[in-house]
Design a protein with these regions (language model features):
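C-terminal alpha-helical "lid" subdomain
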Residues: 174-190, 194, 311-315, 325-434
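The catalytic "switch" region of P-loop NTPases
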Residues: 7-15, 190-355
Length: 434
């Protein structure tokens, strides 16, 4: 095994179970990512540059583009983990038919509610950290003069809907000082966007405004600005599965959603938003399709289209769109070594796979038709964990025979054939005539 795998730290069983079960099911684990992260140094370095900008009071907007299974969600979760460790608050949501950026039936508000439900900090990485953030702010205001609190909230009051938002913050602070749990929960309910009608909010809070489908993004900007008052560096918003906007059948509804993206893009790049970073993940089709994708909205296409100087070997990682490149053969080898160590530690067995076996496994994966352009880490990981499960449950199984039975021609030794010079196993497929 390589030094990377042999020196790997022991993974707690609970974390190992989440990693293995999530990856075998084709989804990204929300915990334990540092144990299995490989590659993506260039992309991660570019996104970490954005975090520095956010901490300085700026804002950023990025698209992560890659095929299904290429590692978009994995990279988003990796950045999420790193941002929380650096003192940022992270909110993430996956779009769906019920959750969009804009909709006539509350789909935009549903996305906001999902973001707030998943709001996370270093001490509450699993989400649901809104009350923790509010309580931290209340504690920071405990021994300061009221004029200091007013000065702290003054920049928020100048923002759109800032007066209503700061009024709720003051109400929460008063309720916390008086031990009024019911009033505190009502303010939390308001911030989460759970009041359905203005009359309901007026009856319980005396407020005639509620967070709605049209203005939820304004409150995201307010929350990002408020987080700095609570001692955090800023807010990172991660929105995945943009393909669900591409799938909207109604062209006008699609355009409204892309218009919302344009608003967010303009706000962050023009300096209208502060302490806020936005990262959206989507497939190449959902972004670049000129008929239904993001590029169908001309104002966005003209802003996001790649310039004339970037090319395949010279990527511009400071551009708004980051296109994920496939992991290299060597990076995948390191990844499956790490997975083998985690699997062995969790199930308490000694793998019989040698490094040559791991290389043979990757040869089989890369030996598929179309693997050069269509093989993704998700497929490699899923197959490898399945192989480990089989070997763990069948200790007498011969690894080489198992790989040979699946790989066949991919593992056949290259042999000169006298007429074509191709590998013997592939001779019948070297050429054909239609």
């Amino acid at each position: 095994m390589s030094d990377t795998a042999s020196a790997a730290p022991r993974v707690p069983k609970r974390v190992a179970a989440v990693i293995l079960n999530s990856l075998k099911g084709g989804v990204v684990p929300r915990i334990g990512l540092p144990y299995i992260t490989v590659g993506r140094e260039v992309e991660i370095r570019a996104l970490l540059t954005d975090l520095s900008l956010i901490a300085d009071g700026g804002a950023s907007f990025r698209f992560l583009v890659g095929r299904y299974g290429a590692g978009k969600s994995f990279l988003l979760q990796t950045i999420r983990t790193h941002a929380m460790g650096e003192g940022f608050v992270v909110a993430d949501a996956d779009l769906s038919p019920e959750r969009r950026l804009q909709g006539g039936q509350g789909q935009g508000l549903a996305t906001y509610r999902e973001l707030i439900r998943n709001i996370s900090t270093k001490t509450r990485p699993e989400g649901g950290a809104l009350n923790l953030i509010l309580d931290r702010w209340v504690a920071s205001c405990a021994d300061v003069d009221e004029s200091v609190v007013n000065a702290q909230l003054a920049p928020l009051e100048e923002m759109v809907h800032g007066f209503d938002f700061t009024r709720m913050l003051r109400r929460y602070r008063m309720a916390a000082a008086g031990g009024d749990e019911e009033a505190m929960s009502r303010v939390t309910k308001w911030i989460r966007g759970e009041y359905r009608t203005k009359s309901e909010a007026r009856a319980e809070l005396g407020s005639s405004t509620i967070i709605s489908d049209d203005d939820w993004y304004d409150y995201v900007k307010l929350i990002a600005r408020f987080l700095v008052c609570s001692g955090y560096k800023g807010m990172l918003v991660l929105i995945d599965e943009l393909v669900n906007l591409y799938k909207i059948p109604n062209a006008i509804t699609r355009q409204y959603n892309y218009e919302k993206i344009l608003t967010m893009y303009n706000d962050t790049l023009q300096g209208k938003a502060q302490y806020l970073g936005m990262i959206m993940g989507g497939t190449p089709t959902s972004i670049e399709d000129r008929r239904r994708g993001v590029f169908s909205y001309e104002a966005l296409r003209s802003r996001l289209a790649q310039g004339r100087f970037a090319r395949e070997d010279l990527k511009d990682m400071l551009a708004p769109i980051i296109r994920l490149q496939p992991l290299t053969y060597e990076e995948l080898l390191v990844l499956i070594e790490k997975l083998m160590q985690i699997h062995a530690g969790y199930f308490g067995w000694t793998p019989t796979l040698t490094e040559n076996d791991l290389v043979d496994f990757l040869k089989i994966e890369f030996g598929r038709v179309g693997a050069d352009t269509h093989l993704t880490p998700r497929e490699v990981i899923r197959d490898f964990i399945e192989l480990l499960d089989i070997l763990c449950q069948n200790p007498d199984a011969n690894v080489a025979e198992l790989l040979q039975s699946v790989g066949g021609d991919a593992l056949a030794p290259a042999a000169a054939t006298g007429d074509t010079g191709t590998a013997g196993g592939n001779r019948n497929f070297a050429e054909f005539t239609i």
